[in-house]
């Protein structure tokens, strides 16, 4: 069932200029996945975006086929739209989205937000939010993209390695405020993906808050792992690792990483 009151609240919290970039906002009380719902809809036209949020999400998409549950009071939503960007730079989508989440949290009063490659948001070395980017189709340099985000707003039923905004901020924002603030920053940052200068800014800004940068880490690729020093990321968003046999580069959809004990 659709929830027009929450959709209206998100719309009202968005700055008026950025409302023009959204073709629609759909909020549904219970969904398997906001990404799946948007994938089943017709793509938006050019620079317009569609937003789908769920009050309860039963099977959100994660990396490496993980499934995530998000209950009432948490934040689960996805965007779908066209972006003008060369296909080789699609790896920067998640990094740019992470910067949008970070900027939104800072404006809401959250400090010391850390970014974990390639698509997670951390506070105090614990996971606050994650995201997943899917390229649905391409037309030249235009990419039809679905970007899903899940954020722990409430601390109820979280695993020990996760953290929530609840108790970490003076005033806990509503779900509508959080979705609107993140959407505002995402729409504001979209154009950066289309130019070399903008992509360089994404890379520099992301590295300035990167978790474990310059430290020993272990990278898993399937059942195999490799250890090394995390050097940073390439101009396409891939991870650079200094190992005993030289530098290795890993793409975001191939690996997971952890710090060495």
List PLM regions with ranges.
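N-terminal lobe of the biotin/lipoate ligase/transferase fold
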Residues: 1-110, 136
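Long, positively charged amphipathic alpha-helical accessory segments at protein N-termini or as interdomain linkers
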Residues: 1-11, 21, 86-87, 91-113, ...
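Short loop/edge segments at beta-strand edges and connector loops
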Residues: 29, 115-117
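Conserved active-site carboxylates
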Residues: 120
